[in-house]
C-alpha cells in the first residue's frame, strides 16, 4: 500500500476509479494564467482521495483535495465500513486459513477472469497492509473479534469498523489530513483537466468552479490551478447519474434506486475520456440483490439478506438457478 501511494506521484495523472490508457481526444485550452500553483491536486475526498493526500503530504508535496459536494467523504463515508484483510489478527483468532493466492483466485473468479491479473495481485498482496495502515497510521478501530464473509469469498476475511460505517475510516483520515495541514476545498467542481497542447502531453492542472452549488452546472467562480507534479483522480462512481448509467447498461434506468450519495455522477468520467483516457468495463455495474426496493438507499434489510445468503445459504436467480 505504501509503495502504491508513493508511485501515484511519479506520473502526470493517476486514476483511482478505473484502469485507463491514453487515446486521442480533444483537450481543454491551457489557461493564459494560472491562479494558483500546488504540487498535487487530488480530486475526490473518499477513502482513496484522502489516503493519497495523506501519503503525498508525508512525502513532502504541497497538496490540496477538491470536493464538489458541501461535505467530504463521498460514498466512502456512508458505506458499510468493511475491509478485506487477509491475514489479519481476527482471522488468526478464529483459526481461518487464508492466503493472498486464495484471495486473488476469488477476485478473478468473481470477475469472470476478465480482470487484469497484475492489478488483482496488487489488491490482494496489499490487503493486509491496507488494514495495518488504517490501524497504525490512522487509529481506526475495527471490531476486535469479528470476521465476516461476503459473497464470492471462499472464507471469512472482512473486518468491520466499530461504528459499522465507512465513517469510522473517513473521519480518521480527515483528522490526519487536518493534522498534516492539507486543505479540503469543498464545493469545488472540476470543470476541466488540462493537458499540454500536444494531445499526448502531461497533465498540467485543472480548471474549477469554487463555490459550486450541486447540482447547478456552472455555479461558482472559475479558477485555474496548476499541478506541478500531477493530478490524482479519486472521484468514485456514477451510479446516481441515471442518464450515464443507462447509457452504459439500459436496464439500469430511472426505475432503479441507488445506494450511492447524490454526488456520484459522471462529469469526470466524461472529462477523463475527453482528455484521452480509454475507460474499460464501465457497464460492469454492481447491483445488490440483497437490497429492498421499498427502503431508501441501503436500508437495513440487506444486513439479514447478506448474512443469510452469503455466509449460511446461497443465491438463486428468478429461475431458481444458483
Residue spans of the language-model regions?
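FAD cofactor-binding and catalytic pocket of flavoenzymes
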Residues: 288-322
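N-terminal secretory signal peptides and thylakoid transit peptides that target proteins
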Residues: 1-15
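N-terminal Rossmann-fold NAD(P) dinucleotide-binding loop
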Residues: 49
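Beta1/beta-strand and adjacent pyrophosphate-binding region of the FAD-binding site
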Residues: 34-46
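Glycine-rich loop(s) and the adjacent beta-strand/alpha-helix scaffold that form part
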Residues: 213-220, 226-296
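Short beta-strand "acidic-cap" motif of Rossmann-like dinucleotide-binding folds
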Residues: 62-67
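Conserved N-terminal/central alpha/beta ligand/cofactor-binding core
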Residues: 11, 68-183, 187-189, 199-202, ...
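Conserved beta-strand-loop-beta-strand element in the redox core of flavoprotein oxidoreductases
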Residues: 195-224
Amino acid at each position: 500500500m505504501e509503495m502504491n501511494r508513493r508511485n501515484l506521484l511519479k506520473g502526470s495523472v493517476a486514476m483511482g476509479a478505473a484502469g485507463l490508457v491514453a487515446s486521442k481526444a480533444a483537450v481543454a485550452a491551457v489557461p493564459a494564467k494560472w491562479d494558483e500553483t500546488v504540487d498535487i491536486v487530488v480530486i475526490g475526498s473518499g477513502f482513496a482521495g484522502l489516503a493519497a493526500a495523506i501519503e503525498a503530504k508525508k512525502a513532502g508535496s504541497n497538496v490540496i483535495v477538491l470536493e464538489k459536494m458541501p461535505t467530504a467523504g463521498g460514498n466512502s463515508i456512508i458505506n458499510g465500513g468493511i475491509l478485506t484483510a487477509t491475514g489479519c489478527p481476527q482471522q488468526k483468532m478464529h483459526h481461518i486459513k487464508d492466503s493472498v493466492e486464495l484471495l486473488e483466485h476469488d477476485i478473478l473468479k468473481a470477475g469472470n477472469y476478465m480482470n487484469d491479473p497484475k492489478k488483482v495481485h496488487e489488491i490482494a498482496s496489499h490487503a493486509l497492509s491496507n488494514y495495518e495502515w488504517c490501524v497504525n497510521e490512522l487509529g481506526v478501530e475495527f471490531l476486535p473479534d469479528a470476521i465476516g464473509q461476503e459473497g464470492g469469498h471462499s472464507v471469512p476475511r472482512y473486518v468491520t469498523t466499530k461504528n459499522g460505517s465507512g465513517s469510522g475510516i473517513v473521519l480518521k483520515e480527515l483528522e490526519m489530513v487536518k493534522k498534516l495541514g492539507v486543505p479540503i476545498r469543498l464545493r469545488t467542481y472540476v470543470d476541466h483537466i488540462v493537458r499540454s497542447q500536444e494531445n499526448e502531453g502531461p497533465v498540467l492542472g485543472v480548471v474549477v468552479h469554487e463555490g459550486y452549488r450541486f447540482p447547478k452546472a456552472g455555479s461558482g467562480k472559475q479558477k485555474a490551478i496548476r499541478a506541478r507534479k500531477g493530478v490524482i483522480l479519486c472521484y468514485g462512481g456514477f451510479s446516481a447519474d441515471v442518464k450515464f448509467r443507462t447509457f452504459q447498461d439500459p436496464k439500469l434506468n430511472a426505475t432503479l434506486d441507488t445506494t450511492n450519495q447524490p454526488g456520484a455522477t459522471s462529469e469526470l468520467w466524461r472529462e477523463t475520456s475527453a482528455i484521452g483516457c480509454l475507460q474499460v468495463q464501465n457497464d460492469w455495474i454492481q447491483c445488490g440483490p440483497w437490497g429492498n426496493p421499498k427502503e431508501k438507499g441501503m436500508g437495513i434489510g440487506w444486513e439479514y439478506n447478506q448474512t443469510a445468503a452469503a455466509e449460511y445459504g446461497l443465491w438463486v436467480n428468478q429461475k431458481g438457478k444458483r
